[in-house]
């Protein structure tokens, strides 16, 4: 996970101090890219422990098109609690845009089903793209999408993913995003008949909140450890049939968790 640590160090040493929506203050850079070869292990932090259960359940929740936190809460995942209304609703966030993008003429587009079909039937297409950034819905979302657009690429029997993230909370959010999209790529590779290739992570505003500086320095002081491997149930061939029990992280030996406050 050296590319992630390099980004964190670069922002601490060279970033611009800015105000932000939450009033916390950030240090940020604009424009950065990291690459992870998924054949070299599952890209999850080893310099601090991550709550993988939350990552898997959130991804399954996205894929099902859900926008209410009930499923997450039932499974002990609290990462969206601060943004939900009294009924648990978040508005037309990721799941809505991925699975039910509404067009001006009244049609509904299931971008994920379209993606699976195009990866299977037209692998060389340059249109394997899913967008969560819908200008017509942004104002009604509890939180506009941070990881807002991704594209897939097939070459030599391998499936790669590039994510564009407009806004990136480096300490708390980015480790989740890396693991989530790496896992999503592996799931799609399995159901579409490919091997996992690369996960390419491209950032707009990549920032450390000012109340995460000391935690970031602690993480940078720790040695990296070998990456674990992710077992995925090979019997599952339908993207929408995956369940939490179909995943198992093997050989994960991280340093202890580092607590940090969430900027809301």
Curated annotation (Swiss-Prot):
A GO CC term assigned to this protein in UniProt: cytosol
Key word Zinc-finger present: no
Chief localization: cytoplasm
SUPFAM superfamilies, sorted: Thymidylate synthase/dCMP hydroxymethylase (SSF55831)
Source taxon at top rank: Bacteria
EC number: 2.1.1.45
Enzyme class label: transferase
GO annotation terms (biological process): dTMP biosynthetic process; dTTP biosynthetic process; methylation
Chain residues that bind (6R)-5,10-methylene-5,6,7,8-tetrahydrofolate: 51, 169, 263
This protein's pathway: Pyrimidine metabolism; dTTP biosynthesis
Binding locations of dUMP: 21, 126-127, 166-169, 177, 207-209
The entry's keywords: Cytoplasm, Methyltransferase, Nucleotide biosynthesis, Transferase
Subcellular location: Cytoplasm
Record-level Gene Ontology MF annotations: thymidylate synthase activity
PROSITE patterns to which the protein is assigned, alphabetical: THYMIDYLATE_SYNTHASE
Pfam families assigned: Thymidylat_synt
Keyword Cell membrane: no
Enzyme active site: 146 (nucleophile)
Catalytic activity annotation: dUMP + (6R)-5,10-methylene-5,6,7,8-tetrahydrofolate = 7,8-dihydrofolate + dTMP
Record family assignment: Belongs to the thymidylate synthase family. Bacterial-type ThyA subfamily.
Assembly behavior: Homodimer.
PANTHER family: THYMIDYLATE SYNTHASE, THYMIDYLATE SYNTHASE 1
Function description: Catalyzes the reductive methylation of 2'-deoxyuridine-5'-monophosphate (dUMP) to 2'-deoxythymidine-5'-monophosphate (dTMP) while utilizing 5,10-methylenetetrahydrofolate (mTHF) as the methyl donor and reductant in the reaction, yielding dihydrofolate (DHF) as a by-product. This enzymatic reaction provides an intracellular de novo source of dTMP, an essential precursor for DNA biosynthesis.
UniProt name for this protein: Thymidylate synthase
Gene assigned in the entry: thyA
